[in-house]
């Protein structure tokens, strides 16, 4: 089975955790677009945003998406990759898009437990809970529009991985 899986969702949804599990179980290569950007630019995302702005970061994100897309890969995308209509279309045309959907409170709780959450610049300058509520309000429709499958990210990473494998092996693509 030769496929490309794109995992989308907000920060804290579990894209990297689930992506690594899936890649391991499928013998695919795991790629995180944020890590790819950091490696190719030799800068942190915070530094890119602080020095060049969000617009430049979004352009780098779009370039990274196309650079890393290859068969037999699980690609964990940055939370804002769906802001570009071209990116949404590209992912739908080139693979299966899995949206890990989680509530703002769950996302905020997970982000507060991650040390790297302090390294990412705030999009709004508000508390993590308020920011995640605003981000989801602005992006939920875009995530849903892009996704072939929407999965409850409140489930354990192992259950999500099992569910995605069942979808893949059943040949269901919506």
UniProtKB/Swiss-Prot annotation:
Mg(2+) binds at residues 16, 32. It comes from the Bacteria. It is found in: Cytoplasm. One of its GO terms (cellular component) is cytosol. CDD domains: SK (cd00464). Pathway: Metabolic intermediate biosynthesis; chorismate biosynthesis; chorismate from D-erythrose 4-phosphate and phosphoenolpyruvate: step 5/7. This is Shikimate kinase 2. It comes from Photorhabdus laumondii subsp. laumondii (strain DSM 15139 / CIP 105565 / TT01). The lineage of its organism: Bacteria, Pseudomonadati, Pseudomonadota, Gammaproteobacteria, Enterobacterales.
């Amino acid at each position: 089975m030769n496929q490309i899986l794109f995992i989308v969702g907000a920060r804290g949804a579990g894209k990297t955790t689930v992506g690594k599990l899936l890649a391991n179980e499928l013998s695919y290569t795991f790629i995180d677009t944020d890590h790819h950007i950091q490696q190719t630019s030799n800068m942190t995302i915070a530094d890119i945003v602080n020095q060049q702005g969000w617009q430049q970061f979004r352009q780098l994100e779009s370039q990274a998406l196309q650079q890393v897309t290859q068969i037999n890969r699980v690609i964990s995308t940055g939370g804002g990759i769906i802001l570009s209509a071209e990116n949404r279309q590209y992912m739908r045309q080139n693979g299966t898009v899995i949206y890990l959907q989680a509530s703002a409170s769950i996302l905020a709780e997970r982000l507060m437990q991650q040390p790297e959450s302090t390294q990412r610049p705030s999009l709004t300058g508000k508390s993590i809970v308020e920011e995640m509520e605003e981000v989801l309000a602005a992006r939920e429709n875009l995530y849903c529009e892009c996704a072939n499958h929407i999965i409850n990210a409140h489930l354990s990473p192992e259950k999500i991985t099992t569910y995605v494998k069942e979808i893949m092996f059943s040949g269901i693509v919506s």
